[in-house]
Amino acid sequence: MNPKIEKLFRSPYSVPNGLQVTDEGVWIADQITDRVALVELTESSDYGVTKLIRDVPTESSNTSGLAYGDDALWLAANGSGSMWRQVRHTDANEGEILKVDPQTGQTLQRHKIPDGGGTHGLEYDHYENGYIWVETLKDKVLHKVRISDWSVQHTIPLPYERAHGVVRFEDGIWVVHTSDRLIIKLEIEDGSKLDEIHVSNEYPEPHGLSLSGDDLLYCDATSGWVVKITF
C-alpha cells in the first residue's frame, strides 16, 4: 500500500508518544510530564501548531500509548518516569494501563499489563464494547482484554520488535512497528499480515496511532510532529 503521507502540525509537547482522535479534537500524551492535551484537529497556524483546548495532569508514567473509550482516556504507562523526570509515588514499576477522567486527569482504574513487562500501545475496541487491546512487549504479542475482570480473551503474535500504536478496524487491526518504520494490518484471529504501510525516512517516525475519519494519524516522539496518512 502506498498512501499519501503529510505532516499536519507539531504537538504542544516535545515528546508526544500517544494520540487519539475524538469528537472534541485530538488528544496527545507527553512522555516526559505525562500530561495529556486536547488540541483542535485543524489547519496549523503560522507557528506550525493548532489551538490548545485544555490539558490535564495524570498519574501515568513514561506514557507510551493512548486510547479513548467508555467516556475516558486510557494511558499506557511503560514503567516509571525516571528516564525523564523525578520519580513520583504514583509511577508504575512496570507496564500498567490507567483509565483516566478526561476532565480532571483523575485515575479511575489501574491494571497491570498481561504477563507483565512494558507496553507501547493499546486500543479501545469500538466494535466490541467492553474490550481493550494491549501490547505485551517482552512476548511480542497483542492481547484482547475484557475490561470488567481484566482477563485475556484472545492473543495474536506481532511480526516485528518495538510495537507501538494500535488501531482497530472492522476487518483487522493496524499496529505500528517504530524501528522498522512499518504500520502493519493484522488479521484479528491469527495475526497474519493483511497489508502494510512503509513510512520512508523523509517523513517523521511513527509512534502513536489513531483513526481519524477514514484516515490515520500518527505522532512522532522524536520530532514532535503529528502526521496524516490518507488511503
PLM features: what roles do these ranges have?
Residues 32, 79-80, 138, 179, ...:
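Residue-level signature of beta-propeller blades and closely related beta-rich strand-turn architectures
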Residues 76-93:
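Short, conserved, GDST-rich strand-edge loop motifs in beta-rich repeat architectures
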Residues 4-10, 47-56, 106-112, 151-157, ...:
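A short beta-strand motif characteristic of beta-propeller blades
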Residues 10-23, 58-71, 77-80, 113-128, ...:
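Beta-rich, blade/repeat-based domains predominating
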Residues 35-37, 86, 95-98, 141-143, ...:
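A short loop-to-beta-strand structural motif that recurs across blades of beta-propeller domains
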Residues 205-231:
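Blade-level signature of beta-propeller repeat domains, shared across WD40, Kelch, NHL, RCC1
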Residues 25-28, 73-75, 131-134, 173-175, ...:
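Conserved beta-propeller blade signature
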Residues 40-45, 101-105, 146-150, 187-191, ...:
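Short loop/turn segments that connect beta-strands within beta-propeller blades
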